[in-house]
UniProtKB/Swiss-Prot annotation:
Chief place where the protein resides: nucleus
GN (gene name): hmg-12
Protein name: High mobility group protein hmg-12
Family affiliation: Belongs to the HMGA family.
Record keywords, A-Z: DNA-binding, Nucleus, Transcription, Transcription regulation
Native species: Caenorhabditis elegans
Length: 315
């Protein structure tokens, strides 16, 4: 041991932090390294050593071999613990096996509360949690993405009563709250067509409505009968004259028929045409040509024969 070494005799104070099992492992490792340097070791509570050695700290590589960046090199003559402004790493988590101190942004930034925010395993970096500032409870699990709240900008949408998609704070479109129409498709914001607002003829309250849409059905035959005469086929059977009022019937009104033309046409009876009887004047002329002139035919009325007329002297 040289004189220079005697003058610069140094001692190390090594402290380890963490769980009890981790500190014991560090203690065994440090003890092995100090034995290689022929250092005198004195163990204080678990995980703390005071090592006196002549050549324990000759250069910085020896301090790195110890395995902790929290090693403090103190000179008994010059240095003092009061001059060291090191960060207290007792409360901050440290990676296992390395002496690298975990980043602790909570000391600089007052916005993030690391006490209540979840921390990733093995690092002291807190997860971003802007929901604490925005006041929105809808935050994705494990991510710091803030939920979109358009209800703050638009007063028409009530996000408290409107359905919300799973996992996002985006409210579903609900124009029915503005339009006041109860006929809205399930799960979509499409507003039902409400024709009753434009046309007064259609009563959507009493008319049947298709399922899922606000489009009313077409009028039935009972609603289309304005005159109260029933169907057009019934008018023909009963013989009622066609009405002069404009109705929704598809058949046009029947034209007027002349009586002279009606006599010549055959009469329809159960789908068959029946010949009309001939006039009496026409039948008498035809019989006169066939029968002899002396004896005319009697057609049910009293008359004289030709012989009686000859004796009487009448023509």
């Amino acid at each position: 041991m040289s004189d220079v070494a005697e003058e610069k005799a140094e001692f190390l104070v090594i402290r380890t932090y963490g769980s009890e099992s981790f500190r014991k492992e560090c203690a065994d490792l440090i003890e092995k390294e100090l034995h290689k340097l022929n250092a005198t070791i004195a163990r204080v509570p678990v995980g703390e050593f005071v090592a006196y050695a002549e050549n324990a700290v000759k250069n910085e590589t020896d301090s790195e071999a110890v395995g902790s960046s929290s090693v403090k090199r103190e000179n008994s003559a010059n240095d003092s613990p009061a001059n060291t402004n090191d960060v207290d790493i007792v409360s901050s988590p440290v990676k296992r096996g390395r002496g690298r101190k975990a980043k602790n942004p909570s000391a600089d930034a007052d916005v993030n509360d690391t006490g209540s925010s979840p921390v990733k395993k093995g690092r002291g970096r807190p997860i971003k949690n802007p929901s604490a500032d925005a006041g929105s409870p809808l935050v994705k699990k494990g991510r710091g993405r803030r939920a979109q709240t358009p209800a703050a900008d638009t007063d028409a949408i009530d996000t408290a009563s409107s359905p919300v998609k799973k996992g996002r704070g985006r409210p579903a479109k609900n124009p029915s709250a503005d339009a006041g129409s109860p006929l809205v498709k399930k799960g979509r914001g499409r507003q039902a067509k409400n024709l009753a607002a434009d046309t007064d003829a259609i009563d959507t309250a009493s008319s049947p409505v298709k399922k899922g849409r606000g489009r009313p059905l077409k009028k039935t035959a009972a609603e289309a009968d304005v005159n109260g005469l029933g169907s057009p086929s019934a008018n023909r059977i009963t013989g009622c004259p066609p009405s002069t009022k404009v109705s929704n019937q598809s058949s046009p009104p029947e034209p007027a028929v002349n009586e002279s033309e009606e006599a010549d046409e055959p009469v329809l009876k159960r789908g068959r045409s029946v010949k009309q009887p001939k006039d009496e004047s026409e039948s008498d002329d035809e019989d006169a040509e066939k029968a002899p002139a002396a004896i005319p035919k009697k057609r049910g009325r009293p008359g004289k024969s030709a012989i009686d007329a000859f004796f009487d002297g009448s023509d």
